[in-house]
Amino acid sequence: MSVEDGGMPGLSRPRQARWTLMLLLSTAMYGAHAPLLALCHVDGRVPFRPSSAVLLTELTKLLLCAFSLLVGWQAWPQGAPPWRQAAPFALSALLYGANNNLVIYLQRYMDPSTYQVLSNLKIGSTAVLYCLCLRHRLSVRQGLALLLLMAAGACYAAGGLQVPGNTLPRPPPAAAASPMPLHITPLGLLLLILYCLISGLSSVYTELLMKRQQLPLALQNLFLYTFGVLLNLGLHAGGGPGPGLLEGFSGWAALVVLSQALNGLLMSVVMKHGSSITRLFVVSCSLVVNAVLSAVLLRLQLTAAFFLATLLIGLAMRLYYGSR
């Protein structure tokens, strides 16, 4: 099955329904990530090491993949696993690792609001790399849809939420921090461009790899997450002294790890049978879930910018996936 241009022609209704349900679940888990992290805060900060959460998430994905392989081993083709095909996934893990660490490093050179707005440029970089690497040409309508998607993300990041009784808009919970003037350094701008390029490249390269290899998705995931665990284990060990692996973890933190692990597996299905563009729409639509959960759980107020962003996302989906 393939979703290159929206829709799933050739799929039966039950499979179409399962695909839609999977995208909705992924959207919900993406949107819940920042509010759940906010609920983990103790005295205004996250009580555990970020590298611990990333490592545990990768380890959870690896264990789930291993379990899936054990359950479905009888349906596998005969012969030894093609271990040589595992090597390319080391680059995927490296790109994802660099991307995750750049997010943290960027905060030193710009304020959170500037990062939230400008990081939407990764939509454009992903689209360009998608066309170049996969040789998939976008129509004018689809290009306009992605521009609207970028505008929606920037609009929401600039002021989709605010504290009750405060007339000044507030960035999403993931970016919330002590008041800081808007700023970005020249080095920060260069790193942001690098971040957007790596973000797009990691997505498109992984999609290309998964589609070209005639291997079960569970085995491909096993390769990817094995390298991911090794990489993040090294980063965690090399991070210097700090809290232990599970120190500071709570029920909310465990829910963050589990939801991100499950979402990673769902995204692998999208990369295998859908496209990097589909992933962009899932991430953008998750802004709506993020805002609603922030309003309910964190008592933040929705602003006009949120409703404008929602309208732009809806229009972008209509342009990209609507009848042409």
Curated annotation (Swiss-Prot):
Keywords: Golgi apparatus, Membrane, Sugar transport, Transmembrane, Transmembrane helix, Transport. GO terms for molecular function: pyrimidine nucleotide-sugar transmembrane transporter activity. It is found in: Golgi apparatus membrane. Residues 1-18, 74-85, 164-180, 236-250, 299-324 are cytoplasmic. GO terms for cellular component: Golgi apparatus; Golgi membrane. It catalyses: CDP-L-ribitol(in) + CDP(out) = CDP-L-ribitol(out) + CDP(in). It comes from the Eukaryota. Residues 40-52, 107-142, 202-214, 272-275 are lumenal. It is a multi-pass membrane protein. SUPFAM superfamilies: Multidrug resistance efflux transporter EmrE. Found in a complex with SLC35A2 and SLC35A3. Mediates the transport of CDP-ribitol. Does not exhibit CMP-sialic acid, UDP-galactose and UDP-N-acetylglucosamine transport activity. PANTHER family: NUCLEOTIDE-SUGAR TRANSMEMBRANE TRANSPORTER (PTHR10231). Belongs to the nucleotide-sugar transporter family. SLC35A subfamily. This is Probable UDP-sugar transporter protein SLC35A4. The gene is SLC35A4.
